[in-house]
């Protein structure tokens, strides 16, 4: 059975999720984190997120291929109806439809939670380089997101300044 299965993440998934996340930390500007978190820290992040928001994994034949989660957009009470989503897919499984299934499932759960606004903060290069392409921008546009703002040169990684685009789901 080769069907992709979406399920709720568990803190015990931390090691497998870190295998997916670590290359993004060490070799890309997709995430602005400099150091790969420990397995304990990552499990703690999963637990903390799941106190209020969904955290999903995509698996096939028992192997986790990617994950996506929502988190608070801003800590102030008036933003309680807004979330920021993040997604990470195994590098060799990108463009296989996993991201689409994860996002669609996550968005459905968020709608059931009465979340009104779904945002993504997307690292975006002025021009593509070895650390960052516009693949995430293109993915989000295909998923119906639109760029609504820009934080110019807000992040410094690999001795380069990067811009982040804010996108919302139509």
What are the language-model segments listed below?
Residues 95-108, 134-138:
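Conserved acetyl-CoA-binding loop-helix of GNAT-fold acetyltransferases
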Residues 69-72, 121-123, 137, 141-160:
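Conserved catalytic-core motifs of GNAT/GCN5-like acyltransferases
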Residues 85, 118-120, 167:
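A structural signal for short, well-ordered beta-strand segments
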Residues 19-36, 49:
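Helix-loop element at the rim of GNAT/NAT acetyltransferase active sites that forms part
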Residues 110-132:
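Conserved GNAT acetyl-CoA-binding A-motif
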Residues 162-170:
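Conserved small/polar residues in nucleotide/adenosyl-binding loops
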Residues 5-17:
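A short beta-loop-alpha structural element at the N-terminal edge
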Residues 34-92, 103-104, 109:
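Acetyl-CoA-dependent GNAT
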